[in-house]
UniProtKB/Swiss-Prot annotation:
Pfam families: SEC-C, YchJ_M-like. This is UPF0225 protein SO_2497. InterPro entries: NTF2-like_dom_sf, SEC_C_motif, UPF0225, YchJ-like_M. Belongs to the UPF0225 family. SUPFAM superfamilies: NTF2-like, Sec-C motif. It comes from Shewanella oneidensis (strain ATCC 700550 / JCM 31522 / CIP 106686 / LMG 19005 / NCIMB 14063 / MR-1). It comes from the Bacteria.
Length: 164
């Protein structure tokens, strides 16, 4: 998958017709994510493209903690393989806030090892925008050699990302 063909977020659209407008308009707000899933996909795409400014600006300030732009730039910087969205929803809470969550696996290769960030991410809608707040990490089972590859190439894992 190349950026010219498909957006890294897995939408099957071109980057220009998908996450690019969100990335370019993060400061102006001219175009913002319309759902927690769209924000999560655009954040994954930003990680792939090393657009760490977008990551910081779409992370709710109350949940940033000590995370900085410089820390993100320093790495680690894995080779991102694919994003798999497992579930997404949004709902209005009793206090009136609109919240959502997205469960996903973001597969990557780092130092020759394949692993995934398997997370249930939480989001909040404030001031006309969705923001990432926090996530609950889970353990991702690595695919077997004969399982379909995590990158959705249609090949077996052993014939694709396992050997890259």
């Amino acid at each position: 998958m190349t950026i010219e063909n498909h957006c890294p977020c897995g939408s099957q659209k071109s980057y220009q017709n998908c996450c690019e407008a969100l990335h370019l308009n993060v400061d102006s707000g001219a175009q913002v994510a319309t759902s927690p899933e769209q924000l999560m996909r655009s954040r994954y795409c930003a990680f792939v493209l090393k657009n760490f400014d977008y990551i910081i600006k779409t992370h709710h300030v109350d949940f940033l903690g000590s995370l900085t732009l410089e820390q993100l730039k320093q790495g680690p910087n894995p080779n991102w393989l694919a994003l798999e969205v497992l579930a997404a929803n949004e709902e209005t809470h009793p206090d009136g806030t609109l919240r959502g969550n997205v469960t996903f696996k973001a597969w990557y290769k780092l130092a020759g090892e394949i692993d995934a960030i398997y997370e249930r991410s939480e989001f909040v809608f404030q001031q006309g925008r969705w923001y990432y707040t926090q996530g609950q990490q889970m353990h991702a089972k690595r695919p077997g050699r004969n399982d379909p590859c995590v990158c959705h190439s249609g090949k077996k894992f052993k014939q694709c990302c396992l050997t890259r």
